Design a protein with these regions (language model features):
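Amphipathic alpha-helical assembly/interaction segments
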Residues: 1-114
Length: 114
């Protein structure tokens, strides 16, 4: 079992969280303590799920939890883009990272099902 912080998906999720904290710090007060807090919390939940999936023998429940939180985070970021809280360019940059993370976790989950 690899250490969770050596996993490529962990490194990508960590990079995403750093970006999320930077992006949400620029939100207006109306959104910073509602949508911004939810985004940061959901990002941190992703790291917890990676840690737990790597730690436990039965990885599937943790990977499924990750994918659930991941979909919510994608929705929140799309809402931010629609509300002009983040630029279209920043949303595109985050989408590339999200796509990479999604592919890695989906492949990991599919490997557990077989």
């Amino acid at each position: 079992m690899a250490l969770y912080y050596d996993l490529p998906v962990y490194k990508d999720v960590y990079a995403l969280i750093r970006e999320l904290f930077v992006c949400t710090s620029n939100f207006s007060q109306a959104y910073k303590y509602s949508l911004g807090q939810d985004i940061k919390r959901d990002g941190l939940n992703l790291v917890r799920s990676i840690y737990r999936a790597n730690k436990h023998k039965d990885k599937l429940p943790h990977l499924e939890a990750f994918l659930d939180d991941f979909e919510l985070l994608k929705l929140e970021l799309r809402l931010c883009s629609d509300l002009k809280l983040i630029s279209t360019r920043k949303h595109a940059e985050l989408s590339v990272l999200l796509s990479s993370i999604g592919k890695q976790v989906t492949a990991w989950r599919n490997a557990q099902v077989v």
